[in-house]
């Protein structure tokens, strides 16, 4: 097993050693220490809106079914028949009345209860043979699972903290406008690290238009060149906080990235240009606002949750991102766009306009991650220092090292 000692193997304030990004041994450790033991974001409730709707999720050796029960409860089960272990549902999504094993037709209802076992005979006890459940929690329409026997107990505190930020967007009542899967040719940690800083955002010409170009700067560090942008930000922030106060929307950052098992950060902040949405002109992409907000000028709600997700909530739509490792050098990034349940494509929103910024940003990040993975695979790679604006990357690596160390000590 690859061993991580944060005080020796990882120089504090520096990136991780190359083998922790590239080796098969480290990848197996990551699955066991992180993905088998954490709370993981996997789907949004609108993806499984109706009874019988399901999504299957692959996580290392595991396959999990997320399904909407007939009583509208969101449930999660291991995708393994209790008869002889066959996979029940194929990868992807769909809708079923019951879950029927394709091998011997054992049949389960949407609560996981075994209804029928072919050739079982009289007296056969179906009771103990329900599908094996997986821990599942929904936070304002965002669905998390944990494969651990005893999931991190701090999830309740996390949920209580972020719910006031998320609830006003009513994501559980939204609908999926579209979903995009891409495979990035890099380790999952590089995908997460890339999202935790914006010093590379000059490589995102579509995204950076709606972001104030003062990321990572303190007021005393603002150069004459950036002074107009800083003054524009100051004015926008004053208007933004006044609006948040009027609408009772929390906005101040809460940051606990590396001090707890369920590390997270959440904040609402203003956007540049029209200040309404992640579009090339900053104007709303959907005329039907989420939750029927009275104004589109609410900036962005940003949330990051260790180890595998980040989210953006706008007044007009929301975007969720789920990171799922496939191999040491391949990672699935699933992006989902949510709009008001009554919004109509072609009338209330244009799909290309809605998705352009993050489709382009994801594609650009895919290139950055591939280059980073190629670099950390090179024998010449030596871990480099994180700069002050990259403190969230450093926090992610510290959180990761703590999880692996805890796993190795048990």
List where the protein language model places each region:
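Short, contiguous pre-domain boundary segments
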Residues: 4-20, 172
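C-terminal catalytic domain of Rieske-type non-heme iron oxygenases
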Residues: 68, 73, 79, 142-410
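Rieske [2Fe-2S] iron-sulfur-binding domain
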Residues: 47-168
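Basic/polar N-terminal segments that are highly enriched at the extreme N-terminus
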Residues: 1-8, 408-410
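Non-catalytic accessory segments flanking enzyme active sites
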Residues: 16, 20-60, 64
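Short, solvent-exposed coil/turn linker segments
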Residues: 17, 30, 43-44, 125, ...
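Short Pro/Gly-enriched beta-strand edge/turn motifs at strand-loop
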Residues: 36-48, 115-119, 303-307
């Amino acid at each position: 097993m690859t061993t991580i000692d944060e005080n020796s193997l990882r120089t504090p304030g520096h990136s991780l050693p190359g083998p922790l990004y590239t080796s098969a041994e480290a990848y197996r450790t990551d699955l066991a220490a992180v993905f088998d033991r954490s709370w993981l974001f996997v789907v949004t409730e609108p993806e499984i809106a109706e009874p019988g709707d399901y999504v299957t999720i692959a996580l290392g050796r595991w396959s999990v079914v997320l399904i909407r029960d007939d009583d509208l409860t969101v449930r999660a089960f291991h995708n393994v028949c209790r008869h002889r272990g066959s996979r029940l549902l194929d990868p992807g999504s769909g809708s079923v009345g019951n879950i029927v094993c394709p091998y011997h037709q054992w049949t389960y209802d949407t609560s996981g209860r075994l209804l029928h076992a072919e050739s079982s005979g009289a007296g056969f006890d179906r009771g103990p043979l329900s599908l094996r459940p997986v821990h599942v929690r929904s936070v304002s329409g965002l669905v998390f699972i944990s494969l651990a026997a005893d999931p991190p107990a701090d999830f309740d505190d996390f949920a209580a903290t972020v719910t006031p930020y998320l609830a006003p967007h009513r994501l559980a009542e939204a609908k999926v406008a579209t979903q995009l899967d891409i495979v990035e040719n890099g380790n999952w940690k590089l995908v997460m690290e890339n999202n935790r800083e914006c010093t590379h955002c000059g490589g995102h010409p579509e995204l950076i238009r709606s972001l104030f170009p003062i990321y990572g700067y303190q007021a005393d560090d603002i150069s004459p060149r950036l002074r107009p942008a800083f003054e524009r930000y100051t004015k926008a922030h004053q208007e933004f906080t006044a609006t948040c106060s009027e609408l009772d929307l929390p906005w101040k950052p809460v940051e606990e990235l590396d001090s707890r098992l369920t590390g997270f950060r959440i904040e609402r902040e203003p956007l540049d240009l029209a200040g309404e949405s992640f579009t090339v002109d900053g104007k709303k992409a959907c005329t039907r606002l989420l939750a029927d907000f009275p104004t589109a000028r609410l900036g962005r709600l940003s949330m990051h949750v260790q180890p595998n997700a980040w989210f953006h909530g706008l007044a007009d739509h929301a975007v969720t991102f789920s990171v799922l490792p496939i191999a040491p050098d391949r990672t699935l990034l699933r992006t989902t766009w949510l709009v008001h349940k009554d919004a109509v494509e072609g009338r209330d929103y244009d799909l290309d306009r809605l998705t352009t910024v993050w489709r382009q940003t994801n594609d650009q990040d895919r290139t950055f991650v591939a280059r980073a993975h190629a670099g950390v695979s090179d024998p010449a790679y030596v871990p480099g220092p994180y700069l002050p604006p990259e403190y969230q990357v450093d926090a992610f690596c510290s959180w990761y090292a703590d999880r692996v160390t805890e796993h190795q000590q048990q």
